[in-house]
Amino acid sequence: MTDLTTLDAAELAGKIHSREVSSVEVTQAHLDRIAAVDTEYHAFLHVAGEQALEAAAAVDNSLAGGNEPASALAGVPIALKDIFTTTDMPTTCASKILEGWVAPYDATLTSKLRAAGIPILGKTNLDEFAMGSSTENSAFGPTRNPWDVTRIPGGSGGGSAAALASRQAPLAIGTDTGGSIRQPAAVTATVGTKPTYGTVSRFGLVACASSLDQGGPCGRTVLDTALLHEVIAGHDPRDSTSIDAPVRPVVAAAREGAAGDLRGVKVGVVKELHSDSYQPGVIASFDAAVEQLKALGAEVVEVSCPSFEHALASYYLVLPSEVSSNLARFDAMRYGLRVDEGNMSADQVMAATRAAGFGPEVKRRIMIGTYALSSGYYDAYYGSALKVRTLIARDFDKAYEKVDVLVSPTSPFTPWKLGEKVGDPLAMYLSDLCTLPTNLAGHCAMSVPSGLSADDNLPVGLQIMAPAMADERLYRVGAAYEAARGPIATAV
């Protein structure tokens, strides 16, 4: 019998819905895989085997009763980043301050997965409160890249990406604040999409930076990712930033793209995201991908977005400022960790709790954000960063007057060794150079595997970017490229 963990989500869905295999069998196969290999990768913080099998059995019983599947992915299990609230398992955000905390409500995204009949295998590891690019900032230990367990799996969503790459889950959910879906996808040879800001509900997503955070789908193929995208997208009145608009036709676009015809599509190569400072193997892989797009019939032109050179500086003022505000809620008074050594004032309890509960990177960003928002510095730092953010959005708008999509490497580097950059925050931040602009503008982007770097035989990703509310363009181009590229090596 075929190892069910080797099949893509779309294949599994077809077999489950035709009752060739059961959802319980598929779910159990992945739970067995987790039990067998996750001690090596540490992709999961919590495994919910009993709940997942109950959800799978409900799907099987419904299908046996002659009912239509609840969704195109009904019965296919998923790994959920541990930053979305769940009532039946802990939500820790990989932080000591929330260790063991169980939320009183499900996130909207969690509810959508349950309603779609998608069993949740468990919660995946991340950088604490989604702050990091390597998943080394987790309070519960780093995740390891299935391609090379001495290397990082990207971040902040390295757990979700590693679960996919190691065949512990056929689907996963991540969040993307500055590249936290796309960069892990690139360095694990998986697919990840940052949807248009406001198209996937943030209700129940523990906030890092509210104007940047966006939940999104992850898979091993473009079609799988599109199928999941349509499940989780949609307006939510409980999220004030949610866009009230129809879900984009991303599945149809992925199927169209797989036919391999990009005639009439204009692709822009961003001059500022193609540098000699990038790893040579990454540039070579990207250049080869661009040639492949040309061969598919796309018209490729170079475009300039000058303000992108300031994206990193802008992002690392906007994000810490919002972090400083959002994480003020962890005050030891309402939920989470409480350090109280007796005879302590409320201020002392709060200070002791935050000192013990937050890790170094979270503290660093809180301090930077508090400083940037302080009296006398607000305009010079935060205000200036917002102006640059506007310029970045304008550069995107000008570019999209000429082209349909933009492309770049997803990350300038392949995955580095665990511990290599922990003591150098700036070196770590540079891995997000190519992904940050999309978040600052609120647009959408995807990372698709583009092969292995000739430098070190490690994965490289092609980033495809599109305007807000044009997510389907990502899937058409991504699926066309994926089909033309053909199969690539897998981690395991």
Curated annotation (Swiss-Prot):
It catalyses: L-glutamyl-tRNA(Gln) + L-glutamine + ATP + H2O = L-glutaminyl-tRNA(Gln) + L-glutamate + ADP + phosphate + H(+). PROSITE patterns: AMIDASES (PS00571). Its EC number is 6.3.5.7. Signal peptide: none annotated. GO terms for cellular component: glutamyl-tRNA(Gln) amidotransferase complex. GO terms for biological process: translation. Disulfide bonds: none annotated. Keywords: ATP-binding, Ligase, Nucleotide-binding, Protein biosynthesis. Heterotrimer of A, B and C subunits. Belongs to the amidase family. GatA subfamily. Allows the formation of correctly charged Gln-tRNA(Gln) through the transamidation of misacylated Glu-tRNA(Gln) in organisms which lack glutaminyl-tRNA synthetase. The reaction takes place in the presence of glutamine and ATP through an activated gamma-phospho-Glu-tRNA(Gln). This is Glutamyl-tRNA(Gln) amidotransferase subunit A.
